[in-house]
From Swiss-Prot:
An example Gene Ontology CC term for this record: cytoplasm
PANTHER family: GLUTAMATE-1-SEMIALDEHYDE 2,1-AMINOMUTASE, GLUTAMATE-1-SEMIALDEHYDE 2,1-AMINOMUTASE 1, CHLOROPLASTIC-RELATED
CDD domains xref list: OAT_like
InterPro entries the UniProt entry points to: 4pyrrol_synth_GluAld_NH2Trfase, Aminotrans_3, Aminotrans_3_PPA_site, PyrdxlP-dep_Trfase, PyrdxlP-dep_Trfase_major, PyrdxlP-dep_Trfase_small
Protein name: Glutamate-1-semialdehyde 2,1-aminomutase
Gene name of this polypeptide: hemL
The species this protein was found in: Leptospira interrogans serogroup Icterohaemorrhagiae serovar copenhageni (strain Fiocruz L1-130)
PROSITE patterns reported for this sequence: AA_TRANSFER_CLASS_3 (PS00600)
Protein family membership: Belongs to the class-III pyridoxal-phosphate-dependent aminotransferase family. HemL subfamily.
Swiss-Prot/TrEMBL cofactor(s): pyridoxal 5'-phosphate
Pathway entry: Porphyrin-containing compound metabolism; protoporphyrin-IX biosynthesis; 5-aminolevulinate from L-glutamyl-tRNA(Glu): step 2/2
Catalytic activity, EC: 5.4.3.8
Length: 443
């Protein structure tokens, strides 16, 4: 019996005998673009999105029963893989405890205490329902704490879809920004400054003119939403030093990197303590979650302790809290991080050799811990989005569809990173490379 196969007729009868093409056409009639997050539409790579029915370990199964080895992993939350047996048991227990309280409960307390005890800059923690919500709330705290209005962000870092941060660098004066989406008013982005990554001089210039007005500098210390743009530690140290010189709070967005690159995230690896930090993905064990954390005096500004209002009906829901707690405990107990790092290097080294043997361009893998990004080889590291090679999107799309056809699922965009999980053991990796070797013969 296929352990991925759903057993409920209420679920399976809906799509029984249907194809992904058929369901996608139906979906487009009732949902924008047929999906509920744009990248899922395959717009970046072309073709029809695969409709998946179930998942287990490192494997996805589509509605036709075809299996794929998954290197997207829901864009990062599933560090243990799909339905890890221990986490699955916790979730099953939770269905018999409560689905939602909307009240005080012990499960969020235990998870918050674990995070706070292991992450020294997270003196207090507030759980929310998404990374976007976490960032929105953290910046509200920063504005309240400083009495300032402006936020400084960096081109190539993604912080969710809130209006004030869905912006890109504009032309003209340093820091000027322009909307990255329709429907965002000019007033929403008037207080957002945007600079290129890897440019300390630009940061210093903006602070010289705007420093007294900037409430927070926000950055992904490991930018992983527009490729994997690994930053120099010297750059990060310098911008943090500059921000603090002007009384600006430092916010690290670790929604992707938190508990992925190590238990203390990039902040721990770098030895740089932010004033506020946002987490998500892994801390929910695969369920919707986000949190913002930081110094006690800053978090005590949040209601009901202080004047900064933030609330949520399903915040700290028991599924996310218990699954997240179990995930973090297992990650600690089994010391998964160094093993995942080694597996990722083995996987990407061999995959790069296969790509270079079969392709008309030279590829390389950019890796950090268990994150990876395949792109055209360049002479210098790529730390800014304007340096991503031309034609990358098209080159990746060809690789994506070659792998997809043969049962390897990558994130459906050349600008999304890939992930390994604890379920990607030596056998799964070897199987992936064997499939890739055969698939690339027709590349």
């Amino acid at each position: 019996m296929n352990q991925n196969k759903p057993t409920s007729k209420l679920i399976s009868d809906f799509w029984k005998g249907k194809t992904s093409e058929e369901l996608f056409e139906r979906a487009k009639k009732v949902s924008p673009g047929g999906v509920h997050s744009p990248v899922r539409s395959f717009r970046s790579v072309g073709g029809t999105p695969v409709f998946f029915a179930s998942a287990k370990g490192a494997t996805l199964t589509d509605i036709s029963g075809k299996e794929y080895i998954d290197y997207c992993l829901s864009f990062g939350p599933l560090i243990l893989g799909h339905r890890d047996p221990e986490i699955e048991e916790v979730v099953r227990e939770t269905t018999e405890i409560a689905w939602s309280f909307g009240a005080a409960e012990p499960y969020s307390l235990e998870l918050a205490e674990l995070i706070s005890s292991r992450v020294p800059w997270a003196e207090k923690v507030r759980f929310v329902n998404s990374g976007t919500e976490a960032v929105m709330s953290a910046l509200r705290v920063a504005r309240a704490a400083t009495g300032r209005e402006k936020i400084l962000k960096f081109d190539g870092c993604y912080h969710g879809h809130l209006d004030s941060l869905l912006v890109k660098a504009g032309s003209g004066l340093a820091g000027e920004s322009s909307s990255d989406s329709a429907g965002i008013s000019a007033t929403s982005i008037a207080n957002t400054l945007v600079l290129p990554l890897d440019d300390e001089a630009s940061v210093e210039r903006v602070f010289e003119t705007e420093g007294k007005n900037i409430a927070a500098l926000i950055i992904e210390p490991l930018p992983a939403n527009y490729g994997l743009l690994i930053q120099r530690k010297e750059f990060l140290l310098k911008i943090v030093e500059t921000a603090r010189k002007y009384g600006t709070l430092v916010v690290f967005d670790e929604v992707i990197s938190g508990f992925r690159v190590g238990f203390q995230g990039m902040s721990g690896l770098l030895g740089i303590w932010p004033d506020l930090v946002t987490y998500g993905k892994i801390i929910g064990g695969g369920f919707p979650v986000g949190c913002y954390a930081g110094k006690k005096d800053l978090l005590d500004l949040v209601a009901p302790s202080g004047p900064v209002y933030q609330a949520g009906t399903l915040s700290a829901n028991p599924f996310g809290m218990r699954a997240g707690l179990a995930t973090l405990k297992k990650a600690q107990r089994d010391s998964i991080y160094s093993v995942l790092d080694d597996r990722t290097k083995i996987f990407t080294d061999t995959m790069t050799k296969l790509l270079n043997k079969k392709s008309n361009q030279e590829w390389e893998a950019v890796i950090h811990s268990s994150l990876f990004w395949f792109r055209k080889k360049t002479q210098q590291p790529i730390r800014r989005i304007d340096l991503i090679p031309e034609g990358h999107k098209e080159s990746f799309a060809k690789v994506f569809h070659t792998f997809l056809k043969n049962g390897i699922y990558l994130a459906p965009s050349g600008y999304e990173v890939g992930f390994l999980s604890w379920a990607h053991d030596d056998e799964i990796i070897a199987k992936t490379l064997e499939i890739a070797d055969k698939a690339l013969k027709t590349f």
